[in-house]
């Protein structure tokens, strides 16, 4: 994964080949709204760092005491290390290098979690459902909040042990964005 600019000089994150878009600047407002709706608290786990839009929203939310992010890209690790220096020394900030599939089970429990990884397989629902199962089994406690970024309009099923809430969010998506639908 590497950082670059699109044809409008806006930030964009692409895969190693530069052909597949991973994240674009237009997502900033949506990511911040996701975190606002999640209302994270306590020790927060984030899957995927990207540009740090959601991380910034998490770290500026009152009641967040610790932040851990799992990130698999070395280029993103470098950006994260610069990012972390801007935040309150009273909040413990951790970077776990690797894929969530390989490291999640080694971590403890969390009060909140935001899932926004890069989809290497194009099977978003399968990937999130696997994560949700593993996270709930190994890392959640009673009252844990779980939120995620999705361009899917509907969720196929919700486990009965979860309260599930979805509300639409409308944003302007640039025409040259190849990975998101025009309306969420």
Model-derived segments and their meaning:
Residues 1-15, 29:
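N-terminal, positively charged/glycine-rich alpha-helical extensions of SAM-dependent methyltransferases
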Residues 24-42:
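Conserved alpha-helix/loop element of class I SAM-dependent methyltransferases that forms part
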Residues 40-52:
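Conserved class I S-adenosyl-L-methionine
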Residues 70-108, 112:
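S-adenosyl-L-methionine
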Residues 76-79, 83, 120-184:
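C-terminal substrate-binding/active-site "lid" region of AdoMet-derived donor-dependent transferases
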Residues 114-116:
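A conserved beta-strand element that flanks and buttresses the S-adenosyl-L-methionine
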